[in-house]
Amino acid sequence: MPKQKTHRASAKRFKRTGNGGLKRFRAYTSHRFHGKTVKQRRQLRKSSMVSKGDFKRIRRMVATMR
């Protein structure tokens, strides 16, 4: 059986945390900031964790990633 390869696009978008979680960057950060409040823009700068529902699927894609 062949080895499972890392999904390279996913590996570039997610980072492993020390506890084994997955960190991701937020959406809605590329343009059209004039329609967002200062508070929204500030909060969009922070990264967030992958939700439990998506974690299993994404973990399989980036299985070999450290």
Swiss-Prot record:
Superkingdom as given in the UniProt entry: Bacteria
Any GO BP: translation
Leader peptide range in chain numbering: none
Pfam families for the chain: Ribosomal_L35p (PF01632)
Biased composition (Basic residues): 1-16
InterPro entries linked: Ribosomal_bL35, Ribosomal_bL35-like, Ribosomal_bL35_CS, Ribosomal_bL35_sf
Keyword RNA-binding tagged: no
The keyword Metal-binding appears for this protein: no
GO cellular component: cytosolic large ribosomal subunit
UniProt similarity note: Belongs to the bacterial ribosomal protein bL35 family.
Name of the protein described by the UniProt record: Large ribosomal subunit protein bL35
Species, as recorded: Lactococcus lactis subsp. lactis (strain IL1403) (Streptococcus lactis)
